[in-house]
Protein backbone atom coordinates (compact mmCIF):
# COMPACT_ATOMS: atom_id res chain seq x y z
CA UNK A 1 0.00 0.00 0.00
CA UNK A 2 1.40 3.39 -1.00
CA UNK A 3 0.65 6.93 0.11
CA UNK A 4 -1.89 7.35 -2.67
CA UNK A 5 -5.32 8.71 -1.79
CA UNK A 6 -8.40 8.55 -4.03
CA UNK A 7 -10.88 11.44 -3.98
CA UNK A 8 -14.35 10.96 -5.47
CA UNK A 9 -15.82 14.37 -6.32
CA UNK A 10 -19.46 13.80 -7.26
CA UNK A 11 -20.67 17.15 -8.62
CA UNK A 12 -23.85 18.58 -10.11
CA UNK A 13 -23.00 18.08 -13.78
CA UNK A 14 -20.11 15.62 -13.69
CA UNK A 15 -18.27 13.13 -11.53
CA UNK A 16 -14.52 13.40 -11.06
CA UNK A 17 -12.15 10.92 -9.48
CA UNK A 18 -8.65 12.10 -8.63
CA UNK A 19 -5.72 10.05 -7.37
CA UNK A 20 -3.27 12.10 -5.30
CA UNK A 21 0.22 10.81 -4.52
CA UNK A 22 2.00 10.88 -1.17
CA UNK A 23 3.14 14.46 -1.83
CA UNK A 24 -0.49 15.59 -2.30
CA UNK A 25 0.04 16.09 -6.05
CA UNK A 26 -2.45 14.98 -8.71
CA UNK A 27 -1.35 11.62 -10.17
CA UNK A 28 -4.42 10.63 -12.20
CA UNK A 29 -7.85 12.01 -13.11
CA UNK A 30 -11.08 10.60 -14.49
CA UNK A 31 -14.14 12.69 -15.37
CA UNK A 32 -17.57 11.93 -16.79
CA UNK A 33 -20.59 14.16 -17.33
CA UNK A 34 -24.07 12.78 -16.76
CA UNK A 35 -27.63 13.64 -17.80
CA UNK A 36 -29.64 16.49 -16.29
CA UNK A 37 -33.37 15.72 -16.24
CA UNK A 38 -35.95 18.54 -16.28
CA UNK A 39 -39.37 16.83 -16.04
CA UNK A 40 -41.21 20.12 -15.41
CA UNK A 41 -40.23 23.82 -15.24
CA UNK A 42 -38.21 24.37 -12.06
CA UNK A 43 -37.68 20.63 -11.52
CA UNK A 44 -34.18 19.12 -11.73
CA UNK A 45 -33.42 15.42 -11.32
CA UNK A 46 -30.52 12.99 -11.68
CA UNK A 47 -30.61 9.24 -12.24
CA UNK A 48 -28.81 7.71 -9.21
CA UNK A 49 -27.86 4.66 -11.29
CA UNK A 50 -26.16 6.90 -13.87
CA UNK A 51 -24.30 8.69 -11.06
CA UNK A 52 -23.18 5.33 -9.64
CA UNK A 53 -21.98 4.19 -13.08
CA UNK A 54 -20.07 7.48 -13.49
CA UNK A 55 -18.29 6.87 -10.17
CA UNK A 56 -17.16 3.38 -11.20
CA UNK A 57 -16.03 4.68 -14.60
CA UNK A 58 -14.07 7.68 -13.30
CA UNK A 59 -12.39 5.76 -10.48
CA UNK A 60 -11.18 3.18 -13.00
CA UNK A 61 -9.90 5.95 -15.28
CA UNK A 62 -8.09 7.78 -12.47
CA UNK A 63 -6.37 4.63 -11.16
CA UNK A 64 -5.25 3.69 -14.69
CA UNK A 65 -4.03 7.24 -15.39
CA UNK A 66 -1.99 7.19 -12.18
CA UNK A 67 -0.32 3.94 -13.28
CA UNK A 68 -1.22 2.14 -10.04
CA UNK A 69 -3.67 -0.47 -8.79
CA UNK A 70 -6.29 -0.22 -6.06
CA UNK A 71 -3.88 -2.03 -3.72
CA UNK A 72 -1.66 1.09 -3.78
CA UNK A 73 -4.46 3.34 -2.46
CA UNK A 74 -4.39 3.95 1.29
CA UNK A 75 -7.81 5.57 1.60
CA UNK A 76 -10.83 7.04 -0.20
CA UNK A 77 -12.30 10.48 0.46
CA UNK A 78 -15.72 11.47 -0.87
CA UNK A 79 -17.09 14.94 -1.57
CA UNK A 80 -20.42 15.61 -3.18
CA UNK A 81 -23.08 18.01 -4.41
CA UNK A 82 -24.96 18.85 -1.24
CA UNK A 83 -28.72 18.78 -0.47
CA UNK A 84 -29.56 16.45 -3.39
CA UNK A 85 -31.88 13.66 -2.16
CA UNK A 86 -31.84 9.93 -2.89
CA UNK A 87 -34.23 7.35 -1.40
CA UNK A 88 -33.61 3.65 -1.99
CA UNK A 89 -34.84 0.20 -0.96
CA UNK A 90 -32.86 -1.13 1.99
CA UNK A 91 -33.00 -4.72 0.66
CA UNK A 92 -32.31 -4.25 -3.04
CA UNK A 93 -30.41 -0.94 -2.96
CA UNK A 94 -32.58 0.33 -5.83
CA UNK A 95 -33.74 3.98 -5.79
CA UNK A 96 -37.51 4.50 -5.62
CA UNK A 97 -37.34 7.76 -7.62
CA UNK A 98 -34.80 9.89 -9.43
CA UNK A 99 -32.59 11.99 -7.16
CA UNK A 100 -34.10 15.45 -6.57
CA UNK A 101 -31.28 17.95 -7.11
CA UNK A 102 -30.40 20.94 -4.92
CA UNK A 103 -31.44 23.33 -7.73
CA UNK A 104 -34.96 21.86 -7.84
CA UNK A 105 -37.74 24.30 -6.83
CA UNK A 106 -40.78 21.99 -6.73
CA UNK A 107 -41.28 22.42 -2.97
CA UNK A 108 -41.52 26.24 -3.08
CA UNK A 109 -45.23 26.23 -2.20
CA UNK A 110 -44.63 23.75 0.65
CA UNK A 111 -41.90 26.03 2.04
CA UNK A 112 -44.33 28.97 1.80
CA UNK A 113 -46.94 26.94 3.70
CA UNK A 114 -44.45 26.22 6.51
CA UNK A 115 -43.53 29.92 6.62
CA UNK A 116 -47.19 30.87 6.94
CA UNK A 117 -47.34 28.55 9.95
CA UNK A 118 -44.53 30.69 11.41
CA UNK A 119 -42.10 27.77 11.43
CA UNK A 120 -39.09 29.35 9.70
CA UNK A 121 -37.67 30.72 12.98
CA UNK A 122 -37.76 27.24 14.50
CA UNK A 123 -36.01 25.65 11.51
CA UNK A 124 -33.39 28.42 11.44
CA UNK A 125 -32.74 28.19 15.18
CA UNK A 126 -32.22 24.42 15.05
CA UNK A 127 -30.50 24.00 11.65
CA UNK A 128 -29.01 27.41 10.79
CA UNK A 129 -30.83 27.23 7.44
CA UNK A 130 -33.80 29.02 5.89
CA UNK A 131 -37.03 27.45 4.66
CA UNK A 132 -36.08 27.19 1.01
CA UNK A 133 -36.58 24.42 -1.59
CA UNK A 134 -32.77 24.37 -1.91
CA UNK A 135 -32.41 22.12 1.16
CA UNK A 136 -33.08 18.38 1.45
CA UNK A 137 -35.90 18.15 4.00
CA UNK A 138 -38.80 19.39 1.88
CA UNK A 139 -37.55 17.37 -1.13
CA UNK A 140 -37.62 14.21 0.99
CA UNK A 141 -41.07 15.10 2.29
CA UNK A 142 -42.28 15.51 -1.32
CA UNK A 143 -40.88 12.11 -2.28
CA UNK A 144 -42.55 10.38 0.66
CA UNK A 145 -45.88 12.02 -0.24
CA UNK A 146 -45.72 11.40 -3.99
CA UNK A 147 -44.17 7.94 -4.44
CA UNK A 148 -46.88 5.35 -3.75
CA UNK A 149 -46.48 3.64 -0.38
CA UNK A 150 -43.18 5.38 0.37
CA UNK A 151 -44.04 6.89 3.75
CA UNK A 152 -45.43 3.62 5.15
CA UNK A 153 -42.41 1.69 3.88
CA UNK A 154 -40.06 4.32 5.36
CA UNK A 155 -41.74 4.02 8.77
CA UNK A 156 -41.17 0.24 8.68
CA UNK A 157 -37.46 0.80 8.02
CA UNK A 158 -37.66 -0.54 4.48
CA UNK A 159 -36.31 2.65 2.84
CA UNK A 160 -33.06 4.58 3.25
CA UNK A 161 -32.66 8.34 2.81
CA UNK A 162 -29.36 9.89 1.95
CA UNK A 163 -27.57 12.76 0.35
CA UNK A 164 -25.30 11.61 -2.49
CA UNK A 165 -22.41 10.70 -0.16
CA UNK A 166 -24.61 8.27 1.80
CA UNK A 167 -25.89 6.59 -1.37
CA UNK A 168 -22.35 6.18 -2.73
CA UNK A 169 -20.99 4.81 0.56
CA UNK A 170 -23.89 2.33 0.67
CA UNK A 171 -23.08 1.14 -2.87
CA UNK A 172 -19.28 1.15 -2.38
CA UNK A 173 -19.54 -0.98 0.76
CA UNK A 174 -22.09 -3.40 -0.68
CA UNK A 175 -24.85 -2.09 1.60
CA UNK A 176 -22.83 -2.56 4.79
CA UNK A 177 -22.48 1.13 5.73
CA UNK A 178 -25.44 3.51 6.10
CA UNK A 179 -23.70 6.70 7.18
CA UNK A 180 -23.16 10.38 6.40
CA UNK A 181 -20.96 13.12 7.81
CA UNK A 182 -21.88 16.19 9.85
CA UNK A 183 -21.48 18.67 6.95
CA UNK A 184 -23.93 16.85 4.69
CA UNK A 185 -26.36 16.26 7.56
CA UNK A 186 -26.27 19.99 8.34
CA UNK A 187 -27.77 20.79 4.90
CA UNK A 188 -30.92 18.69 5.26
CA UNK A 189 -33.20 20.98 7.36
CA UNK A 190 -33.49 18.02 9.75
CA UNK A 191 -30.21 18.17 11.70
CA UNK A 192 -29.73 20.16 14.90
CA UNK A 193 -26.32 21.81 14.51
CA UNK A 194 -26.04 22.64 18.23
CA UNK A 195 -26.81 19.17 19.61
CA UNK A 196 -25.29 17.40 16.57
CA UNK A 197 -28.25 15.07 16.19
CA UNK A 198 -31.30 14.56 13.99
CA UNK A 199 -34.04 16.83 15.34
CA UNK A 200 -37.20 14.93 16.29
CA UNK A 201 -39.43 18.03 16.24
CA UNK A 202 -38.39 18.93 12.69
CA UNK A 203 -38.78 15.33 11.53
CA UNK A 204 -42.33 15.37 12.87
CA UNK A 205 -43.16 18.62 11.05
CA UNK A 206 -41.76 17.26 7.77
CA UNK A 207 -43.35 13.83 8.45
CA UNK A 208 -40.05 12.00 7.98
CA UNK A 209 -39.60 8.68 9.87
CA UNK A 210 -36.32 8.59 11.83
CA UNK A 211 -35.88 4.94 10.79
CA UNK A 212 -34.79 6.00 7.30
CA UNK A 213 -31.98 8.35 8.39
CA UNK A 214 -28.25 7.47 8.36
CA UNK A 215 -25.78 7.56 11.25
CA UNK A 216 -23.84 10.87 11.36
CA UNK A 217 -20.04 10.75 11.75
CA UNK A 218 -17.11 13.18 11.92
CA UNK A 219 -15.68 14.24 8.54
CA UNK A 220 -12.59 12.06 9.10
CA UNK A 221 -13.87 8.72 10.37
CA UNK A 222 -14.28 5.06 9.47
CA UNK A 223 -17.12 5.09 6.93
CA UNK A 224 -16.65 1.50 5.76
CA UNK A 225 -14.55 -0.50 3.32
CA UNK A 226 -15.11 -0.76 -0.42
CA UNK A 227 -16.26 -4.12 -1.75
CA UNK A 228 -13.26 -5.96 -3.24
CA UNK A 229 -15.22 -6.80 -6.40
CA UNK A 230 -15.44 -3.12 -7.43
CA UNK A 231 -11.79 -2.10 -7.84
CA UNK A 232 -9.85 -5.33 -7.29
CA UNK A 233 -8.98 -4.58 -3.66
CA UNK A 234 -10.64 -3.29 -0.51
CA UNK A 235 -9.99 0.37 0.33
CA UNK A 236 -11.12 2.11 3.54
CA UNK A 237 -13.39 5.15 3.14
CA UNK A 238 -11.96 7.56 5.71
CA UNK A 239 -13.12 11.06 4.72
CA UNK A 240 -16.44 12.67 3.71
CA UNK A 241 -17.57 16.29 3.35
CA UNK A 242 -20.07 18.24 1.25
CA UNK A 243 -18.42 20.01 -1.66
CA UNK A 244 -18.25 23.53 -0.22
CA UNK A 245 -16.99 22.32 3.14
CA UNK A 246 -14.43 20.11 1.39
CA UNK A 247 -13.22 23.20 -0.51
CA UNK A 248 -12.95 25.09 2.80
CA UNK A 249 -10.76 22.27 4.12
CA UNK A 250 -8.78 22.08 0.84
CA UNK A 251 -8.08 25.81 1.18
CA UNK A 252 -6.78 25.13 4.73
CA UNK A 253 -9.25 27.64 6.20
CA UNK A 254 -8.79 26.20 9.69
CA UNK A 255 -8.57 29.46 11.66
CA UNK A 256 -11.44 31.69 12.77
CA UNK A 257 -11.91 34.52 10.30
CA UNK A 258 -10.48 32.66 7.32
CA UNK A 259 -12.71 32.74 4.27
CA UNK A 260 -12.97 30.93 0.95
CA UNK A 261 -15.19 31.35 -2.08
CA UNK A 262 -15.74 28.75 -4.78
CA UNK A 263 -16.70 29.94 -8.26
CA UNK A 264 -18.31 27.12 -10.21
CA UNK A 265 -21.89 26.84 -11.52
CA UNK A 266 -22.83 28.95 -8.51
CA UNK A 267 -20.70 30.75 -5.95
CA UNK A 268 -20.41 29.69 -2.33
CA UNK A 269 -18.52 31.69 0.29
CA UNK A 270 -17.75 30.26 3.74
CA UNK A 271 -16.34 32.15 6.72
CA UNK A 272 -14.88 30.06 9.54
CA UNK A 273 -16.38 31.21 12.87
CA UNK A 274 -14.63 28.59 15.00
CA UNK A 275 -16.69 26.91 17.70
CA UNK A 276 -19.14 29.87 17.73
CA UNK A 277 -22.60 29.33 16.24
CA UNK A 278 -23.13 32.79 14.74
CA UNK A 279 -26.81 33.51 14.07
CA UNK A 280 -27.07 35.66 10.96
CA UNK A 281 -29.22 38.78 11.00
CA UNK A 282 -28.58 39.22 7.26
CA UNK A 283 -30.09 36.00 5.90
CA UNK A 284 -26.82 34.14 5.60
CA UNK A 285 -26.73 30.46 6.53
CA UNK A 286 -25.16 29.16 9.71
CA UNK A 287 -23.67 25.78 8.92
CA UNK A 288 -21.09 23.21 9.97
CA UNK A 289 -17.70 23.82 8.35
CA UNK A 290 -16.33 20.48 9.56
CA UNK A 291 -16.33 18.15 12.54
CA UNK A 292 -12.99 16.61 13.48
CA UNK A 293 -12.10 14.57 16.57
CA UNK A 294 -15.59 15.21 17.94
CA UNK A 295 -15.22 19.03 17.82
CA UNK A 296 -17.55 20.99 15.55
CA UNK A 297 -16.30 24.07 13.69
CA UNK A 298 -19.02 26.35 12.31
CA UNK A 299 -19.23 28.77 9.41
CA UNK A 300 -21.35 31.51 7.92
CA UNK A 301 -22.23 30.69 4.33
CA UNK A 302 -23.51 32.78 1.48
CA UNK A 303 -24.89 30.99 -1.58
CA UNK A 304 -25.14 32.57 -5.03
CA UNK A 305 -27.05 30.38 -7.47
CA UNK A 306 -25.59 31.76 -10.72
CA UNK A 307 -21.85 32.42 -11.24
CA UNK A 308 -20.17 30.35 -13.96
CA UNK A 309 -23.68 29.52 -15.20
CA UNK A 310 -23.94 33.15 -16.41
CA UNK A 311 -20.87 32.62 -18.59
CA UNK A 312 -22.40 29.38 -19.93
CA UNK A 313 -25.51 31.39 -20.82
CA UNK A 314 -23.39 33.91 -22.72
CA UNK A 315 -21.82 31.03 -24.65
CA UNK A 316 -24.80 28.70 -25.21
CA UNK A 317 -27.78 31.06 -24.99
CA UNK A 318 -26.60 34.38 -26.41
CA UNK A 319 -23.69 32.92 -28.46
CA UNK A 320 -21.76 36.03 -27.38
CA UNK A 321 -18.58 34.03 -26.75
CA UNK A 322 -17.16 30.83 -28.22
CA UNK A 323 -15.70 29.51 -24.98
CA UNK A 324 -15.70 30.48 -21.32
CA UNK A 325 -11.95 31.07 -21.59
CA UNK A 326 -12.63 34.02 -23.96
CA UNK A 327 -14.66 35.95 -21.40
CA UNK A 328 -11.81 37.75 -19.58
CA UNK A 329 -10.18 38.95 -22.81
CA UNK A 330 -13.52 40.26 -24.12
CA UNK A 331 -14.35 42.01 -20.83
CA UNK A 332 -11.00 43.77 -20.97
CA UNK A 333 -11.99 45.34 -24.31
CA UNK A 334 -15.29 46.74 -22.98
CA UNK A 335 -15.86 50.51 -23.08
CA UNK A 336 -15.00 51.80 -19.58
CA UNK A 337 -17.49 54.67 -19.98
CA UNK A 338 -20.46 52.32 -20.41
CA UNK A 339 -21.97 51.12 -17.13
CA UNK A 340 -23.92 47.97 -17.96
CA UNK A 341 -25.28 45.77 -15.14
CA UNK A 342 -26.44 42.18 -15.53
CA UNK A 343 -28.38 40.71 -12.60
CA UNK A 344 -28.28 36.93 -13.25
CA UNK A 345 -31.43 36.01 -11.31
CA UNK A 346 -32.23 33.17 -13.71
CA UNK A 347 -33.48 30.99 -10.84
CA UNK A 348 -34.18 33.76 -8.34
CA UNK A 349 -31.57 35.34 -6.07
CA UNK A 350 -29.76 33.56 -3.26
CA UNK A 351 -28.04 35.18 -0.29
CA UNK A 352 -28.53 37.70 1.13
CA UNK A 353 -31.85 38.34 -0.72
CA UNK A 354 -33.38 34.83 -0.93
CA UNK A 355 -35.96 35.90 -3.49
CA UNK A 356 -37.02 32.88 -5.61
CA UNK A 357 -39.28 35.10 -7.74
CA UNK A 358 -36.61 37.63 -8.77
CA UNK A 359 -35.82 37.41 -12.48
CA UNK A 360 -32.71 38.27 -14.48
CA UNK A 361 -32.30 41.65 -16.16
CA UNK A 362 -29.74 43.82 -17.95
CA UNK A 363 -29.60 47.56 -17.25
CA UNK A 364 -27.74 50.43 -18.89
CA UNK A 365 -28.00 49.31 -22.52
CA UNK A 366 -27.34 51.90 -25.22
CA UNK A 367 -27.03 51.78 -29.00
CA UNK A 368 -23.28 51.34 -28.56
CA UNK A 369 -23.48 48.37 -26.19
CA UNK A 370 -21.82 45.29 -27.67
CA UNK A 371 -20.84 41.75 -26.63
CA UNK A 372 -17.81 43.09 -24.74
CA UNK A 373 -19.96 45.16 -22.36
CA UNK A 374 -22.43 42.29 -21.79
CA UNK A 375 -19.60 39.85 -21.03
CA UNK A 376 -17.99 42.32 -18.64
CA UNK A 377 -21.34 42.82 -16.90
CA UNK A 378 -21.74 39.05 -16.45
CA UNK A 379 -18.29 38.68 -14.88
CA UNK A 380 -18.77 41.76 -12.72
CA UNK A 381 -22.11 40.38 -11.49
CA UNK A 382 -20.21 37.54 -9.82
CA UNK A 383 -17.93 40.09 -8.15
CA UNK A 384 -20.82 42.32 -7.04
CA UNK A 385 -22.68 39.36 -5.55
CA UNK A 386 -19.51 38.34 -3.72
CA UNK A 387 -19.32 41.86 -2.30
CA UNK A 388 -22.94 41.54 -1.10
CA UNK A 389 -21.98 38.34 0.74
CA UNK A 390 -18.83 39.85 2.25
CA UNK A 391 -20.76 42.89 3.51
CA UNK A 392 -23.39 40.64 5.11
CA UNK A 393 -20.69 38.50 6.74
CA UNK A 394 -18.95 41.55 8.18
CA UNK A 395 -22.23 42.76 9.67
CA UNK A 396 -22.83 39.37 11.30
CA UNK A 397 -19.33 38.63 12.50
CA UNK A 398 -16.50 41.07 12.95
CA UNK A 399 -13.14 39.46 12.15
CA UNK A 400 -12.17 37.92 15.47
CA UNK A 401 -8.45 37.62 14.80
CA UNK A 402 -7.92 41.29 13.96
CA UNK A 403 -6.41 40.54 10.52
CA UNK A 404 -7.62 42.00 7.25
CA UNK A 405 -10.03 39.94 5.18
CA UNK A 406 -8.21 37.83 2.60
CA UNK A 407 -10.39 35.75 0.30
CA UNK A 408 -9.05 32.38 -0.87
CA UNK A 409 -10.68 31.42 -4.16
CA UNK A 410 -11.12 28.27 -6.23
CA UNK A 411 -13.31 26.85 -8.98
CA UNK A 412 -13.32 27.13 -12.76
CA UNK A 413 -13.76 30.92 -12.95
CA UNK A 414 -10.65 31.77 -10.94
CA UNK A 415 -8.35 30.95 -13.87
CA UNK A 416 -9.34 34.36 -15.33
CA UNK A 417 -6.87 37.00 -14.13
CA UNK A 418 -9.22 39.79 -15.23
CA UNK A 419 -12.11 38.44 -13.15
CA UNK A 420 -9.94 37.93 -10.06
CA UNK A 421 -8.52 41.46 -10.31
CA UNK A 422 -12.01 42.92 -10.66
CA UNK A 423 -13.09 40.80 -7.67
CA UNK A 424 -10.29 42.26 -5.53
CA UNK A 425 -11.16 45.78 -6.76
CA UNK A 426 -14.86 45.52 -5.89
CA UNK A 427 -14.31 43.69 -2.59
CA UNK A 428 -11.56 46.14 -1.62
CA UNK A 429 -9.75 43.09 -0.24
CA UNK A 430 -6.86 40.86 -1.37
CA UNK A 431 -7.79 37.71 -3.30
CA UNK A 432 -5.52 34.64 -3.10
CA UNK A 433 -5.51 32.00 -5.83
CA UNK A 434 -3.86 28.71 -4.78
CA UNK A 435 -1.44 26.64 -6.86
CA UNK A 436 -3.75 23.61 -6.64
CA UNK A 437 -7.18 24.51 -8.00
CA UNK A 438 -8.63 21.03 -7.28
CA UNK A 439 -9.35 22.21 -3.74
CA UNK A 440 -12.66 20.38 -3.27
CA UNK A 441 -11.15 17.00 -4.12
CA UNK A 442 -8.00 17.89 -2.18
CA UNK A 443 -10.08 18.61 0.94
CA UNK A 444 -11.77 15.20 0.74
CA UNK A 445 -8.43 13.53 0.08
CA UNK A 446 -6.81 15.25 3.07
CA UNK A 447 -9.60 14.07 5.39
CA UNK A 448 -8.97 10.48 4.27
CA UNK A 449 -5.18 10.70 3.95
CA UNK A 450 -4.64 12.27 7.36
CA UNK A 451 -6.96 9.70 8.94
CA UNK A 452 -4.95 6.92 7.26
CA UNK A 453 -1.72 8.44 8.58
CA UNK A 454 -0.16 8.86 5.12
CA UNK A 455 -0.74 12.63 4.83
CA UNK A 456 0.19 15.48 7.22
CA UNK A 457 -1.94 16.57 10.16
CA UNK A 458 -3.96 19.79 10.13
CA UNK A 459 -0.98 22.03 10.92
CA UNK A 460 1.24 20.37 8.33
CA UNK A 461 -1.47 20.58 5.67
CA UNK A 462 -2.02 24.30 6.38
CA UNK A 463 1.72 24.94 5.98
CA UNK A 464 1.73 23.08 2.66
CA UNK A 465 -1.00 25.34 1.20
CA UNK A 466 0.66 27.43 -1.52
CA UNK A 467 -0.44 30.62 -3.27
CA UNK A 468 -0.19 30.97 -7.03
CA UNK A 469 -0.97 34.69 -7.04
CA UNK A 470 -2.39 37.44 -4.84
CA UNK A 471 -4.64 40.05 -6.48
CA UNK A 472 -4.52 43.37 -4.60
CA UNK A 473 -7.28 46.03 -4.93
CA UNK A 474 -6.27 48.72 -7.43
CA UNK A 475 -9.56 50.61 -7.99
CA UNK A 476 -10.01 54.05 -6.40
CA UNK A 477 -12.74 54.43 -3.79
CA UNK A 478 -14.84 56.88 -5.83
CA UNK A 479 -15.04 54.52 -8.81
CA UNK A 480 -15.79 51.54 -6.59
CA UNK A 481 -18.56 53.37 -4.69
CA UNK A 482 -20.20 54.47 -7.93
CA UNK A 483 -20.17 50.96 -9.34
CA UNK A 484 -21.57 49.45 -6.13
CA UNK A 485 -24.38 52.01 -6.05
CA UNK A 486 -25.30 51.14 -9.64
CA UNK A 487 -25.35 47.45 -8.77
CA UNK A 488 -27.61 47.96 -5.74
CA UNK A 489 -30.04 49.96 -7.88
CA UNK A 490 -30.10 47.19 -10.50
CA UNK A 491 -30.75 44.46 -7.90
CA UNK A 492 -33.54 46.51 -6.28
CA UNK A 493 -35.30 46.69 -9.64
CA UNK A 494 -35.18 42.90 -10.16
CA UNK A 495 -36.50 41.87 -6.74
CA UNK A 496 -40.08 40.58 -6.78
CA UNK A 497 -41.07 43.12 -4.13
CA UNK A 498 -39.26 45.93 -5.93
Swiss-Prot record:
GO annotation, cellular component aspect: cytosol
Listed InterPro entries: ATPase_NBD, Carb_kinase_FGGY, Carb_kinase_FGGY_CS, FGGY_C, FGGY_N, Glycerol_kin
Domain of life: Bacteria
Residues that bind ADP: 12, 16, 265, 308, 412
Keyword ATP-binding recorded: yes
Sorted UniProt keywords: ATP-binding, Glycerol metabolism, Kinase, Nucleotide-binding, Transferase
Catalytic class of the enzyme: transferase
The protein's Enzyme Commission number: 2.7.1.30
GO terms (BP aspect): glycerol catabolic process; glycerol metabolic process; glycerol-3-phosphate metabolic process
Pfam families: FGGY_C (PF02782), FGGY_N (PF00370)
Keyword ATP-binding attributed: yes
Annotated glycerol binding sites: 82-83, 134, 243-244
Pathway(s) of this molecule: Polyol metabolism; glycerol degradation via glycerol kinase pathway; sn-glycerol 3-phosphate from glycerol: step 1/1
Assigned protein family: Belongs to the FGGY kinase family.
HAMAP family: Glycerol_kin (MF_00186)
Function, in words: Key enzyme in the regulation of glycerol uptake and metabolism. Catalyzes the phosphorylation of glycerol to yield sn-glycerol 3-phosphate.
Protein name per its UniProtKB record: Glycerol kinase
Species for this entry: Rhizobium rhizogenes (strain K84 / ATCC BAA-868)
Gene label: glpK
Amino acid sequence: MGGYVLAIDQGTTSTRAIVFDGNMKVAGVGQKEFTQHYPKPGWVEHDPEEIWASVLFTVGKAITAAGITAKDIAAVGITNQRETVVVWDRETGKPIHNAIVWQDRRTASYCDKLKRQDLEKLFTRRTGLLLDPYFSGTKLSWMLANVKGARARAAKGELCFGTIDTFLIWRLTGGKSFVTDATNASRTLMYNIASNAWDEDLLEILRVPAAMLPEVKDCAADFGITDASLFGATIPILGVAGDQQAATIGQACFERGMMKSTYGTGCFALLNTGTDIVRSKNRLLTTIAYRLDGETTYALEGSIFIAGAAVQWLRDGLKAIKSAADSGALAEKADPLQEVYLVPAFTGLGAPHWDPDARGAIFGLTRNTGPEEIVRAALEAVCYQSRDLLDAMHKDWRNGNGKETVLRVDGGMVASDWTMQRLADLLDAPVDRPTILETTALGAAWLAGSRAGVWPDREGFAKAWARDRRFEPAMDEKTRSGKLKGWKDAVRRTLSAG
